[in-house]
Amino acid sequence: MNATVVPPYSGHWLTNTDRMGGLAYGIGVSIGILMLITTITLTSYYCTRSHISASPTTTPRTRRRQRESNGTLPPGQERFDFEDDESDTVVVEVLGLTEEVIKGFPKLPYEEARVSYSLQKESSTTSCCSICLADYKKMDMIRVLPDCNHLFHDNCVDPWLRLHPTCPVCRTSPLPSPAMTPVADVVPFSRRPMMDI
């Protein structure tokens, strides 16, 4: 009779070949996943980098010039761009208002602004500046934004308007829109003859 002799279990992981195969499999899968993540990351980096440098005709400066020639740059707003000697272009877009436009908004002492503008309607900007959250004092210089009549300290709202072309509270643009034509001028009123009954 042929009897196979099975060695007794020693309990040590290095002598057990089944456990050794499981460990090798786990290490192999971990290394494979790590290599896959690295490959995807490097490939996406190089593809993005080559895509940016492959299209020199659509630089931000070219797009800015196209927008300016189309007339999409609103009046009273500025854009600045800086170019270095290398092939990279740095564009800084400042969409705020020009200094001339900002200085054109009413600026007066708080006492006068409160009487002239704020008593018409009670709002959150009548007693304190929404930017610095400080209460207005009688002699504080206040800038009043047109259309919404919100009040702000002039030294608080002027830097805001240089960067943003809208009111900090309601986001209304203080600039007149380019297409402000009354409807009556475009479509005349139609008149129906009145019928006596």
Swiss-Prot record:
Taxonomic path: Eukaryota, Viridiplantae, Streptophyta, Embryophyta, Tracheophyta
PANTHER family, per the entry: RING-H2 FINGER PROTEIN ATL71-RELATED, TRANSCRIPTION FACTOR C2H2 FAMILY-RELATED
Pathways per UniProt: Protein modification; protein ubiquitination
Top-level EC class: transferase
Entry keywords, A to Z: Membrane, Metal-binding, Transferase, Transmembrane, Transmembrane helix, Ubl conjugation pathway, Zinc, Zinc-finger
The organism of origin for this protein: Arabidopsis thaliana (Mouse-ear cress)
Record's protein name: Putative RING-H2 finger protein ATL71
Residues that span the membrane, as ranges: 20-40
Encoding gene per record: ATL71
Free-text note on domains in this protein's UniProt record: The RING-type zinc finger domain mediates binding to an E2 ubiquitin-conjugating enzyme.
ZnF segments: RING-type: 129-171
EC id: 2.3.2.27
